[in-house]
Amino acid sequence: MSKKQGANKSLATPPPAAESNKNAAKSVDKKSAAAEKPKRRYFGLLTRKEKWVLSWRGRLVVWGALLMLGLIFILRVHPFLAVTERVGCEYLVIDGWVPNYALEESIAEFKGKSYVKIFTVGADPLTGKNIEEGDSIALEAYNRLKWMGVDPAVMQAVPAHIKYRNRTFQSAMALRHWIEENHEPVTSFNLVTLGPHARRSRLLFEEAFDGKARVGIISVTHREYDPKRWWKYSEGVKEVISEGVAYFYARCFFHPGKNDIN
């Protein structure tokens, strides 16, 4: 055999080390393919697969983020719900179910600003003794204000004779209907309510008036708990959670139909 032929044969035949590496690579590829293929048991009802999980650093980051969000919620949710944003107006609307101390603050608001009239609103009582036909929370608030010394000439009770469904919205609709039927020149008003109920009340009154009047809101501070530490009081937890859920529902899912509006 010539030297040239020997050289060509040497080039055509891979060295033993290269052949070994090639076989090892094929073996690794086969093992990888076998590992990637999910293992099945019990006629394919169970499958075993590889998955990614959080490391301890990842879990620490996730828990830290959740803790931060929780703190932000605790500190910001009450001021968000118990909002006070007045508008310039001559009319004061009072949620009839508020306690007497809220009515006292409403009287101070009325006397300290250029209001000319008070409307009390509310639906039928849910519970109570000696309830007579025609009684309403709006009329009860009217009588309490009268007893506190407010001149009846500057007040008007506007009851919404409904007991169970959409009480705040129906109270707003009753006020709108009264204003339209009596041709009262109301283009804006401030609504007085209690604590975290404020943001939802304003939303529902704006829904009811549908742009025909600007709605301001005044939230009277709830005295049964400290608003800055509401999570330490059962009444505070109940108010914030219930009103938070109710506001979310009203904002996202409440769409009044013709029966509600009429």
Predicted features by range, described:
Residues L54-W56, F73, F248:
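Short alpha-helical segments used as structural interaction elements across diverse proteins
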Residues S55, V61, Y233:
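Residue-level signal for threonine
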